[in-house]
Amino acid sequence: GVGYCDTAKMLTNWRSSEELGFLSEVSVVPLQQSLRHLQSAFSNFWKKTSRYPRFKSRKKSVLSLEYSRSGFRIKNGEVYLAKMKEPLDIVWSRECDINSASTITVKCDKAGRWFISLLCESRVEEKPITGKTVGIDLGVKDAVVLSDGKKLNPDRRAQKKNEERIKRGQKALARKQKDSKNWEKARLKLSRAYARYTDAKRDWLHKTTTYLVNTYDVLCIEDLNVSGMTRKVSGEGRSAKSGLNRSILSNNLSELRFMLEYKSQWYGKECVAIDRFFPSSQRCSECGYINQELTLNDRHWTCSECGTHHDRDINAAKNIKAAGLAVIACGDGARLES
């Protein structure tokens, strides 16, 4: 087969040819990195760990360049890329030891914003022990509900404004002739509205998950099946289900869990996922009675056995906490009884 060495030789010939001579105007390093990625993609395909590599359209793909250590230099705290006389004008999002960078990736997103990411070695220090355990119920009305009664939500008003900007942008784009100058202006404006929306959500997710791992040592969550929760239905109730699906997806439950898990691992905390079929909302956290008649519309309910009045989500979070502690006590292979 054709491997990286073969394609690297082809690249040398392409750069010296009349038809593809423009390739010599840029550094060879990101071109070589693209060939390495191509080889990795085909290797993964032959190993049956991924599907057949697809052609990446210049219009639809995110523009990116990857530089290995030979393709950039760092001088006086500034980054110079190969074939560039001036350093990059960078607004750093965080402090890092740029001198230890082994790879630099430059990207331009669909909103026309340029980003640079550096692969550096960094030692993550464990967070102080707090001795606290919390159950976390991830939901729709309230994004995050804790067993101690706290409810954490993004700024819904700002979120709604961003959604309205996107709707206006979609309507404006639909009125333009595709690929015209005005269409491109409208597309860029819509992309920036999407970027503002997703950036705000990601910022809230990072701040919320960082708060949780700073405050608690053990975090108990449900193993939610988001794809199953957002499955489409036909017939009666289709419109209501579509609205529910949008609300679930807008809270980014899967990404929130992913962040919780890797940050817990980083900072020496424990994140426990309980069985997705555990009836956390239906079970009374005081006596264990299961209310089979509870519906999604019931935000509060009173236990018919012990008389305790419950906030649906806080009660679920308390049950998740108890179930998580049981999993820790019995081992990962334990299965909780309903």
Roles of regions detected by a PLM:
Residues 94-100, 109-338:
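Positively charged, helix-rich recognition surfaces that bind polyanionic ligands
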Residues 1-10, 175, 179:
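N-terminal structural subdomain of ketosynthase/condensing enzymes
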